[in-house]
C-alpha cells in the first residue's frame, strides 16, 4: 500500500474504488442454505461440537502437539475455530465446561459471520436446511429450471 502511494500519489483504496466492476462471464445460479431458526442452529452447533469431543478431538490435539513439538498457537492451523479454544484449554488449565462453552461460542460466531456474508451476495434462492422440505430436490429443480434442463 505504501509503495502504491509512493508511486502514484493515491492510496490503494482509491485505486480499488476506481476499478471497473464487470459481472463474471458465467451464468451463475447461487443457492445457499440459510437456517431461519437461530435457536435450532445454535443447538445443532453445540451438538456437533460435543460430538467432535466425544470422537477424540482433544486426543487429536495432544497427538499433534507430540508429533510436532515446534507447533505453537501462532500457526494458522491452530488459530482455526475449535483448535484455538482447545489449545487455550490445554495451556491454561481452565475447566472443561468453560472450554466447551468457548468452543461452541466461537463456532456460533463463525456461523454468524458466514450467514452475514451469504446475505450480502445475490442469491437466486435460499433454502432452510431445517425446514421439512427436501432442500436437495428443491435446489436441483431450481438449477434445472434456471439452465433449462
Model regions: which residues?
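Phosphate/Mg2+-binding loops and adjacent switch elements
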Residues: 2-28
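Catalytic core of IPPT-family isopentenyl/dimethylallyl transferases
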Residues: 23-149
